[in-house]
């Protein structure tokens, strides 16, 4: 591990030199690339330097115990050794986590797609519950939520809702939400009091930047139509809604949330770019690791990852076997217990694979 850490520190110093080079300063692409690389390893280098400093202090303290010391001084040095050993262990554990390969998408904004699946109107209502849950979680993180496209039902649910969450690290925390979410509750329309089971699917896509994926205008078909609101009524007599079709991949995106056709096209383009990027990313991952299934789930849209049981006020995440009896609070956006546990599980698996 120490050899790897020293190599990281050496690279950090080299990047300092490169970022001072006039040729790099005048090349915006290189400047962005090297700045990001340095930013990505800065915390590792800082913790490694602190770790080296603590190790040196520990060695000096242990060397003092070899000298002739009076009882009081020896006790003080022993206490210092004990404290430094604790610090060394804590820093070593942090470094192991920092050396785990990072997902290059972790810092990105996300596009979230929620669709009512099995269960009809009840599934659509649950899709609305999930949208509000993620919106409140985003608000707690200081992130911004922006609806891109929504298809309403007469009861106030969503057949489909697509929205963007803007915030640093959004993908790192929300990527584990990919999959099928199951709800068990008595619908308001159920007179017999029977519990129904419905599902909604969640897809979390990292926002793709223009430099990451090249989409040509000639490959996109643009269709316009009048937008509609809940219940299907027309809310705009102008042709402001936009549908984009990427001809090479067949990916289709529509947006009608804005009154302006230009703004709808801009929003739709963001979703189109993210979906195409996600398609290529998943294909590359499948080729790289076709048979391996991560403990946190494959991200398959049909995979049941979590159950929300209303009568018992509990939520169970089936991937990590975690059950929490606070469904009401979780639907208010208090997702940290699940998200932190999933992040830790993911890190543990990656550390195990790296050893």
From Swiss-Prot:
- Known Gene3D superfamilies for this protein? 3.30.160.20, 3.30.70.1660, 6.10.140.1950
Q: Which InterPro entries match?
A: PCRF, Pep_chain_release_fac_I, Pep_chain_release_fac_I_sf, Prokaryotic/Mito_RF, RF-1
The name under which this protein is listed is Peptide chain release factor 1
Keywords tagged on the record: Cytoplasm, Methylation, Protein biosynthesis
This entry carries the following GO cellular component terms, namely: cytoplasm
Coiled-coil annotation reads none
List locations, semicolon-separated: Cytoplasm
Q: Which gene encodes it?
A: prfA
The record's SUPFAM superfamilies line, in alphabetical order, gives: Release factor (SSF75620)
Q: What's the PTM story here?
A: Methylated by PrmC. Methylation increases the termination efficiency of RF1.
Has the keyword Cytoplasm been applied to this entry?
yes
* Pfam families, alphabetized: PCRF, RF-1
Give the family this protein belongs to, as stated in its UniProt record: Belongs to the prokaryotic/mitochondrial release factor family.
Q: Which residues are modified to N5-methylglutamine?
A: 233
Q: Where is it mainly found? A: cytoplasm
**Functional description taken from the UniProt entry:** Peptide chain release factor 1 directs the termination of translation in response to the peptide chain termination codons UAG and UAA.
- An example molecular function term from Gene Ontology annotations: translation release factor activity, codon specific
């Amino acid at each position: 591990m120490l050899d790897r850490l020293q190599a990281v520190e050496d690279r950090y110093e080299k990047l300092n030199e490169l970022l001072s080079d006039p040729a790099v300063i005048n090349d915006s692409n290189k400047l962005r690339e090297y700045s990001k690389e340095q930013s990505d390893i800065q915390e590792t280098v800082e913790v490694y330097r602190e770790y080296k400093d603590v190790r040196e202090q520990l060695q000096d303290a242990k060397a003092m115990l070899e000298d002739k010391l009076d009882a009081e001084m020896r006790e003080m040095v022993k206490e210092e050794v004990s404290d430094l050993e604790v610090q060394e262990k804590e820093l070593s554990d942090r470094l192991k986590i920092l050396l785990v390969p990072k997902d290059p998408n972790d810092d990105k904004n996300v596009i979230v797609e929620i669709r009512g699946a099995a269960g009809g109107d009840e599934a659509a209502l649950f899709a609305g519950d999930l949208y509000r849950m993620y919106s409140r979680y985003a608000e707690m993180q200081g992130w911004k939520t922006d609806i891109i496209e929504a298809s309403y039902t007469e009861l106030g649910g969503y057949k489909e809702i697509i929205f963007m969450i803007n915030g640093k690290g959004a993908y790192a925390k929300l990527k584990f939400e990919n999959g099928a979410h199951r709800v068990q509750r008595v619908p308001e329309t159920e007179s017999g009091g029977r519990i129904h089971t419905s599902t909604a699917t969640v897809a979390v896509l990292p926002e793709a930047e223009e430099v990451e994926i090249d989409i040509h205008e000639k490959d996109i078909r643009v269709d316009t139509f009048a937008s509609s609101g809940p219940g299907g009524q027309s809310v705009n007599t102008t042709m402001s809604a936009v549908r984009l079709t990427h001809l090479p991949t067949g990916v289709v995106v529509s947006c009608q949330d804005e009154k302006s056709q230009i703004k709808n096209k801009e929003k739709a383009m963001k979703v189109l770019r993210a979906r195409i990027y996600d398609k290529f990313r998943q294909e590359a991952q499948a080729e790289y690791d076709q048979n391996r299934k991560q403990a946190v789930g494959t991200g398959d849209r049909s995979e049941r990852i979590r159950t929300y049981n209303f009568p018992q006020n509990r939520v169970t995440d089936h991937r990590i076997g975690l059950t929490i009896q606070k469904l009401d609070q979780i639907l208010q956006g208090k997702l940290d217990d699940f998200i932190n546990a999933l992040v830790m599980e993911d890190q543990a698996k990656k550390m195990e694979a790296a050893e």
